[in-house]
Amino acid sequence: MKANELRALDDAQLREKLAEYKVELFNLRFQKATGKLTNTARPRLVKKEIARILTILRERELAQAELG
């Protein structure tokens, strides 16, 4: 997903996506260890998605701290 699409989601949905991506990354690591990973670029993409989500959550957290 693009960052703009992620920003349209609320915090609960972002945390849900984050959990999904973490599970996917965990499974991809196992596939790599067993030699069954076919798309070797996928783990890198999943890590970037996780970073995007964490960045957006942190931005919102800091914005709330400034306001209140």
Swiss-Prot record:
HAMAP family: Ribosomal_uL29. One of its GO terms (cellular component) is cytosolic large ribosomal subunit. Belongs to the universal ribosomal protein uL29 family. InterPro entries: Ribosomal_protein_uL29 (IPR050063), Ribosomal_uL29 (IPR001854), Ribosomal_uL29_sf (IPR036049). The keyword Transferase does not apply. GO terms for biological process: translation. GO terms for molecular function: structural constituent of ribosome. Keywords: Ribonucleoprotein, Ribosomal protein. This is Large ribosomal subunit protein uL29. It comes from Chloroflexus aurantiacus (strain ATCC 29366 / DSM 635 / J-10-fl).
